[in-house]
Amino acid sequence: MRNSFPQFIFNRFRKNEAQLHELTYLFWECTLRCNLNCRHCGSDCSADSTAKDLPFDDFLRAILPLQKAYKKNSITIAITGGEPLMREDLPQCGRLLRENGFLWGMVTNGYGYTPEIHGKLLAAGMGSVTLSLDGLESSHNWLRANGQSFARAVQALDLIAAANHLVYDVVTCVNGRNIGELEAVMEFLIARKAKAWRLFTISPIGRAAGNEDMSLRPEQLKRLMDFIAQARADGRIQVTFSCEAYLGKYERKVRDSYFFCRAGIQIASVLTDGSISACPNIDRSFVQGNIYRDDFLEVWNNRFEVMRDRRWTKTGICKGCDAYKNCDGGALHLWDEKRDAIMSCIHQQLNPSRQSEPASYS
């Protein structure tokens, strides 16, 4: 595969970013409790989770040293779960983050997002929010396993879309059930004055592992990419594909930039048990330390080598792939503790003739 000059330059940029590893985005997995029981949950969360919430004081104490290493407001804390709104102290946590020089936002399913909590979060300095809406009513309620979840998410969308100066997007997990209604979902979002829409596929992890209803066939993946490319060309709403995979000829057509898995390079996380990792949905074998025994900044500066030098990913179907120099082993959440083969490859499914080795999934 011959690279374009822009792709070549971007590959150099990606290597340089891995060497610099400046932290810009920090997930706080504040709870594993959730008010839904979604069929595709990568963290296997539930309302009766026995895992304790991570105390905010412990989290704040761990990240305060970042103030000396980074400029004020240069790091965004993305609060996730579980469902962050299960924590009654969420507005207070957000306010203290802002007072200590951190931007913050949250990822929510919208089920508990009421006008009252919306006002409290804005007053606490919330600057960004990601809201899940997984299709039209029937499809969304099926995936979320709750007959009221769509109505609650739409209420949240209306509140969020009406807020001035709030950065937000709506995310949709595309699956075999909702792939045929993307056009209708887009029209729905435009009618509700949504400005940004990000689409994901569902990875074979957590509850989605082994569930064929969650995955897309190659022809459906192509349909998804063509839809996004056309929607971006039309320009009626800002539509992007997620950062989950290298896409070959669809690069820059469905995203603003080339594929770059920034886990452990610019993205870190503190999980509910205090573990220090990258994106919360990657395998726990990638954990680099724990705030209860390690200094977070020291861990960030001196560990994470497995994420910053990914030559170990050149195995399995990646070993002979002619797109490897652009992909660098794909997204880390698609590698398990064995690390002997990527679990799924969208590029291979979109371009089966470009793969020099037969598929072999773990």
PLM-predicted stretches and their roles:
Residues 2-128:
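Conserved alpha-helical substructure of the radical SAM core
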Residues 8-13, 17-22, 281-362:
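Flexible mid-to-C-terminal extensions adjoining Fe-S/redox cofactors in radical SAM and related proteins
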Residues 27, 31, 35, 258, ...:
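Residues immediately within or flanking Cys/His clusters that coordinate Zn2+
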Residues 33, 37, 41-44, 264, ...:
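Cys/His-rich metal-chelating microdomains
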Residues 34, 274, 296:
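Conserved, mostly hydrophobic/aromatic
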Residues 49-50, 103, 123-124, 128, ...:
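Radical SAM enzyme [4Fe-4S]-AdoMet core and its adjacent flexible, acidic
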